[in-house]
Amino acid sequence: MEQAPEDQGPQREPYNEWTLELLRKLKSEAVRHFPRIWLHGLGQHIYETYGDTWAGVEAIIRILQQLLFIHFRIGCRHSRIGIIQQRRSRNGSSRS
């Protein structure tokens, strides 16, 4: 009869510690890119919707990830990641 292999991988930290660390990092990054009043409003909305639960933590993580992804994708002035078009000179030539 087959047996499942024993877990021989590296020891992982518990889910709740990992989740709170991820939230901390996302919040510190979000503060660099969005007005604090927006983030406060988002936090209030999450708290009113989910209360003080893990579902609320997971929801705010998901929303912050989406906001930051879109922010970088559109083109953040603080980052080299993005889709900002290069400005062309008036005669239409581009430098290559």
Swiss-Prot record:
UniProt keyword list: Activator, AIDS, Apoptosis, Cell cycle, Host G2/M cell cycle arrest by virus, Host nucleus, Host-virus interaction, Ion channel, Ion transport, Modulation of host cell cycle by virus, Phosphoprotein, Transcription, Transcription regulation, Transport, Viral penetration into host nucleus, Virion, Virus entry into host cell
Claim: Ion transport is one of the keywords in the record: yes
GO cellular component: host cell; host cell nucleus; host extracellular space; virion component
Positions where Phosphoserine occurs in the chain: 79, 94, 96
Annotated localization: Virion; Host nucleus; Host extracellular space
Gene Ontology terms describing biological process: DNA-templated transcription; monoatomic ion transmembrane transport; protein homooligomerization; regulation of DNA-templated transcription; symbiont entry into host cell; symbiont-mediated activation of host apoptosis; symbiont-mediated arrest of host cell cycle during G2/M transition; viral penetration into host nucleus
Top-level taxon: Viruses
Residues covered by region (Homooligomerization): 1-42
InterPro entries the record matches: RetroV_VpR/X
Keyword Transcription attributed: yes
Post-translational modification remark: Phosphorylated on several residues by host. These phosphorylations regulate VPR activity for the nuclear import of the HIV-1 pre-integration complex.
Family: Belongs to the HIV-1 VPR protein family.
HAMAP family to which the protein is assigned, alphabetical: HIV_VPR
Additional information: HIV-1 lineages are divided in three main groups, M (for Major), O (for Outlier), and N (for New, or Non-M, Non-O). The vast majority of strains found worldwide belong to the group M. Group O seems to be endemic to and largely confined to Cameroon and neighboring countries in West Central Africa, where these viruses represent a small minority of HIV-1 strains. The group N is represented by a limited number of isolates from Cameroonian persons. The group M is further subdivided in 9 clades or subtypes (A to D, F to H, J and K).
Record's function text: During virus replication, may deplete host UNG protein, and incude G2-M cell cycle arrest. Acts by targeting specific host proteins for degradation by the 26S proteasome, through association with the cellular CUL4A-DDB1 E3 ligase complex by direct interaction with host VPRPB/DCAF-1. Cell cycle arrest reportedly occurs within hours of infection and is not blocked by antiviral agents, suggesting that it is initiated by the VPR carried into the virion. Additionally, VPR induces apoptosis in a cell cycle dependent manner suggesting that these two effects are mechanistically linked.
Oligomeric form and interacting partners: Homooligomer, may form homodimer. Interacts with p6-gag region of the Pr55 Gag precursor protein through a (Leu-X-X)4 motif near the C-terminus of the P6gag protein. Interacts with host UNG. May interact with host RAD23A/HHR23A. Interacts with host VPRBP/DCAF1, leading to hijack the CUL4A-RBX1-DDB1-DCAF1/VPRBP complex, mediating ubiquitination of host proteins such as TERT and ZGPAT and arrest of the cell cycle in G2 phase.
Protein name as annotated: Protein Vpr
